[in-house]
Amino acid sequence: NLPKLPNSLTVLLCYNNNISILPELPHSLITLYCWCNKISKLPELPNLLTNLLCYNNKISSLPKLPDNLEKLSCSNNNIKELPELPEHITHIVCKSNLLIKIPKLPISNKLIYLDCSRNNLAELPRGISTIEKVIYSRNPIYKKIRKLSYLELYDINNK
């Protein structure tokens, strides 16, 4: 595991290291890349954090997301619920978890990319139509959506 981190640290790259516990994160941290470890719980996230890539771990829940967070990639974990989404979030990749719903989108909704495929989603939040790219395949919601008369579907699974 990692030692105490310097107070002035802005970028922490600790991916592919078999880490199970992260130490307290410095308030100056802007980028945290901790994918492909054995982390089950993240510490409190600094408010300056804009990029969080924590996919391929053993995380079951995320802490409160910082107000400045723009990019979140938390795929291939055991997350059942995402915390409230911050105003500045633009990209979320949360595929291959245990999610049953996506939280309400922020009023400012700056989200341009959402990949929530391979979860247990039965519904999508209001305002989803303003997002440029949404990937929601392999969710129970797919059965409801394909019944919409104005929607054109393309099956790309066997091509």
What label would you give each PLM region?
Residues N1-K4, T10, C14:
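Low-complexity/repetitive intrinsically disordered segments
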Residues L111-K159:
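Leucine-rich solenoid repeat scaffolds
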Residues V11-C14, L32-C34, T50-C54, L72-C74, ...:
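Conserved hydrophobic beta-strand positions in leucine-rich repeat
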Residues S8, S20, S28, S40, ...:
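Serine residues within intrinsically disordered or low-complexity segments
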Residues N7-L9, P26-I30, P46-T50, P66-E70, ...:
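Short "repeat-start/strand-capping" segments in structured domains, especially the N-termini
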Residues L2-L5, L22-L25, L42-L45, L62-L65, ...:
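Canonical leucine-rich repeat
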